From Swiss-Prot:
<feature type="transmembrane region" description="Helical">
    <location>
        <begin position="112"/>
        <end position="132"/>
    </location>
</feature>
<feature type="transmembrane region" description="Helical">
    <location>
        <begin position="49"/>
        <end position="69"/>
    </location>
</feature>
<keyword id="KW-0813">Transport</keyword>
<dbReference type="GO" id="GO:0005886">
    <property type="term" value="C:plasma membrane"/>
</dbReference>
<protein>
    <recommendedName>
        <fullName>Probable polyamine transporter At1g31830</fullName>
    </recommendedName>
</protein>
<feature type="transmembrane region" description="Helical">
    <location>
        <begin position="230"/>
        <end position="250"/>
    </location>
</feature>
<dbReference type="GO" id="GO:0009507">
    <property type="term" value="C:chloroplast"/>
</dbReference>
<feature type="transmembrane region" description="Helical">
    <location>
        <begin position="442"/>
        <end position="462"/>
    </location>
</feature>
<keyword id="KW-0812">Transmembrane</keyword>
<feature type="transmembrane region" description="Helical">
    <location>
        <begin position="267"/>
        <end position="287"/>
    </location>
</feature>
<keyword id="KW-0769">Symport</keyword>
<feature type="transmembrane region" description="Helical">
    <location>
        <begin position="156"/>
        <end position="176"/>
    </location>
</feature>
<dbReference type="GO" id="GO:0015846">
    <property type="term" value="P:polyamine transport"/>
</dbReference>
<feature type="transmembrane region" description="Helical">
    <location>
        <begin position="79"/>
        <end position="99"/>
    </location>
</feature>
<dbReference type="GO" id="GO:0015203">
    <property type="term" value="F:polyamine transmembrane transporter activity"/>
</dbReference>
<comment type="similarity">
    <text>Belongs to the amino acid-polyamine-organocation (APC) superfamily. Polyamine:cation symporter (PHS) (TC 2.A.3.12) family.</text>
</comment>
<dbReference type="InterPro" id="IPR002293">
    <property type="entry name" value="AA/rel_permease1"/>
</dbReference>
Length: 495
């Protein structure tokens, strides 16, 4: 896009650490103790998200509870399923959460990972990151109204197909979209209530299971009968998306301190929400591996506690889908707002409603959900996973590049490892991504490539629209300037 005049809040607080070469955007940040005095902004009146709601927003961005982890037992047996949910967080979840904590506090704004990649690799790749992540988020979100109705159709068969199902999906999407419109703080506290309701039945189930536990059932393993594709995809599906919360960093109360702590608590909450239900279900019920598919926890609940506990688990599953929907939509819509504030999207995407929410971003995300809700998701969801993988590779590269090029930059939270440690930390999750990609089908890879090519075409189209002034692009004056050239700091580093 053409060069624009950028007005920063405080030029002295925005510092570059390298020359603006080719398409690279130099690092610039306002540190925790460098916040300049400025006139009150419109967004200052908007209530910020505090610790507890943020933890549960992270919980729903990543997990929502143990619904869907049953396939891990079906694919690999009890021992590998349990080991997977113990070991996998150290390979994937913790590195992703740590990178999100460091980069999210380095750039505490709603662009999140888009800004990280733009700063390290340039605006073209930053836009591609935004396109792939937003698209994968919308595809992901289109599943939840459908899954919600799938949990209810056993009690209300009319919701299984036809006009009642279509109408229900539309009404549910509108209601949850309106909740997002009313404000992120409301969404956060609703997520807390939904989260407590979704977790409690498994706590009850765990207590009831104690007298019937047989630890030997946890140790069953058959390496000759493992579906590695299903196993890895189940682990990956249930333990990713930690970076999604970064697109809400601008709405968080004191993000430099709140975000890292919330991610820490979120990792513990998510891991416990998987491991303890698996321990209870595997240890208290005789193993019938073929039955461990989506929804089997409701059968476990009935066997252990009766019909009332089964209904509670089913209601918790339905509630969990609503929680994941509102959390994902918040992340997707604020990402579009953050990209518009950085001049990557037309200015009208940065407009907020009277509740402080990105109205157009919400409408765009909701429209994508409604359009995709009528499709068959088996292949397209796998394609969404591949888009997410490519986006994560860009994030790892951006993280390492910033550590190498700007080691002395202000980082309110910094992972206590050096540059070599940063590279080593990214190797295991990168290998895992390669494994997921290698196990995917050619059809899925083809769909993913088509989606990426669309992103490659949209970026120059937006550049053309900007040059022709068909729509207005601008960079928010409330944000630090990522392109300001100040050699003094770099010279200080050299000395």
């Amino acid at each position: 896009m053409q060069k624009r005049r950028i007005i920063t809040v405080n030029p002295s607080a925005s510092i570059e650490m390298s020359q603006y070469e080719n398409n690279e955007v130099p690092y610039s940040s306002v540190g925790a103790d460098e916040v300049p005095s400025s006139p009150p902004k419109a967004t200052d009146k908007i209530r910020k998200v505090s610790m507890l709601p943020l933890v549960f927003l992270i919980f729903y961005e990543v997990s929502g509870g143990p619904f869907g982890v049953e396939d891990s037992v079906n694919a690999a047996g009890p021992l590998l399923a349990l080991l997977g949910f113990v070991i996998f967080p150290f390979i994937w979840s913790i590195p992703e959460a740590l990178i999100t904590a460091e980069m999210g506090t380095m750039y505490p704004e709603n662009g999140g990972y888009v800004v990280w990649v733009s700063s390290a690799l340039g605006p073209f790749w930053g836009f591609q990151q935004g396109w792939m992540k937003w698209l994968s988020g919308v595809i992901d979100n289109a599943l939840y109204p459908v899954l919600f109705l799938d949990y209810l159709k056993s009690g209300v068969p009319a919701l299984g197909s036809g006009l009642p199902r279509v109408a229900s999906i539309l009404v549910l999407t509108i209601l949850l979209t309106y909740l997002n419109y009313r404000g992120l703080t409301i969404v956060g506290w609703v997520a807390v209530l939904m989260g407590v309701f979704s977790i409690l039945p498994f706590a009850v189930m765990g207590l009831i299971s104690i007298p019937q536990l047989e630890p030997s059932r946890w140790l069953v393993m058959d390496l000759g009968n493992v579906n590695w594709n299903l196993y890895l995809n189940t682990l990956f599906w249930n333990l990713n998306y930690w970076d999604s919360i970064s697109t809400l960093a601008g709405e968080v109360e004191n993000p430099n301190h709140t975000l890292p702590k919330a991610l820490f608590y979120g990792v513990i909450l998510v891991a416990c929400s998987y491991i303890f239900p698996l321990l209870a279900g595997i240890g208290a019920i005789p193993l019938e591996r073929e039955k461990w598919t989506d929804g089997y926890f409701s059968d476990v609940a009935k066997a252990l506690g009766g019909a009332w506990l089964r209904w509670w688990v089913q209601a918790a599953a339905a509630t969990s889908n609503m929680g994941m929907f509102i959390a994902e939509m918040s992340s997707d819509s604020f990402q579009l707002l953050g990209m518009a504030e950085r001049g990557m999207l037309p200015e009208f995407f940065a407009k907020r409603s009277r509740y402080g929410t990105p109205l157009l971003g919400i409408l765009f995300s909701a429209s994508g959900v409604v359009l995709l809700s009528w499709l068959s998701f088996q292949e397209i969801v796998a394609a969404e996973n591949l888009l997410y993988c490519v986006g994560m590779i860009l994030e790892f590269i951006a993280f390492v590049r910033m550590r190498m090029k700007h080691p002395a930059a202000s980082r309110p939270y910094k992972i206590p490892i050096g540059t070599t440690g940063s590279i080593l930390m990214c190797i295991p999750p990168t290998i895992l991504i390669c494994a997921v990609v290698a196990l995917s089908s050619l059809k899925v890879a083809a769909v993913s490539i088509v989606m990426m090519i669309i992103g490659f075409l949209i970026h120059p189209l937006l550049n053309h629209m900007d040059r022709k002034r068909w729509v207005k692009f601008s960079i928010s004056s409330d944000l630090p300037d990522l392109q300001q050239q100040t050699r003094e700091y770099e010279e200080t580093l050299i000395r």
